[in-house]
């Protein structure tokens, strides 16, 4: 009996020692890499992106941006939207079978003669007087994206490097504009609103007979 007790104690100590060594085994580099791989695999493949939301009385136009094709135009539009620049402006020019145009701050007033003559870039891009924001314009970023229905493009004067804040949305395909105006986005939701706006009764200057105001904001969506 005396011999059995020491033997049992020895077995117990051996088992405790083995159990302890298993708990304290270090994590190998391979295991760490596997953990990192698992975490990366669980990350969403499509992180949230910024889209434009143009709100009208007919509903929302949701716009995705082509940042790689026209980075300056996208940046300027987003800055204007975030600063509330577009809020209260209207779609001041509508041509059925062609496009709807907006983004002119002059349209916050009632003087239709000034519609289509206002606006500027949201920051200085090297053109205009740096100390006079009203002179800031965007350099052309013409690209290979075709002017199809739903395309968001920048309006300008006869000078290619004269984009400001005014934009237009194609109500129909307009391939004759390709390479002449900078495409920087497209409507991905709410296309029926384009039709509702473009078919409004209008005057001889293509101004809608009633005001369709907009509010523009930037949101993050999947």
Tell me the role of every PLM-derived stretch.
Residues 10-12, 52:
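Small side chains
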Residues 2-8, 15:
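Sec-dependent signal peptide recognition
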């Amino acid at each position: 009996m005396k011999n059995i007790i020491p033997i049992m104690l020895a077995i117990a100590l051996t088992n405790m020692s083995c159990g302890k060594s298993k708990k304290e085994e270090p994590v190998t580099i391979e295991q760490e890499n596997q953990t990192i791989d698992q975490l990366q695999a669980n990350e969403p493949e499509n992180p949230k992106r910024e889209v434009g939301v143009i709100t009208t009385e007919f509903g929302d136009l949701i716009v995705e941006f082509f940042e790689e094709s026209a980075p300056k135009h996208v940046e300027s539009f987003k800055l204007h939207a975030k600063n509330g620049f577009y809020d209260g402006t209207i779609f001041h020019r509508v041509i059925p079978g062609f496009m709807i145009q907006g983004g002119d701050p002059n349209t916050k007033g009632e003087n239709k003669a000034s519609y289509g003559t206002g606006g500027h870039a949201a920051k200085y891009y090297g053109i205009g007087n740096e100390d006079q924001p009203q002179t800031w314009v965007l350099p052309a970023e013409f690209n290979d994206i075709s002017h199809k229905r739903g395309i968001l493009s920048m309006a300008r004067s006869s000078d290619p490097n004269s984009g400001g804040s005014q934009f237009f949305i194609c109500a129909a395909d307009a391939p004759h504009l390709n390479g002449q105006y900078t495409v920087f986005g497209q409507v991905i939701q709410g296309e029926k609103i384009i039709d509702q706006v473009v078919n409004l009764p209008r005057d001889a200057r293509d101004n809608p007979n009633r005001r369709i105001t907009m509010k523009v904001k930037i949101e993050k969506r999947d």
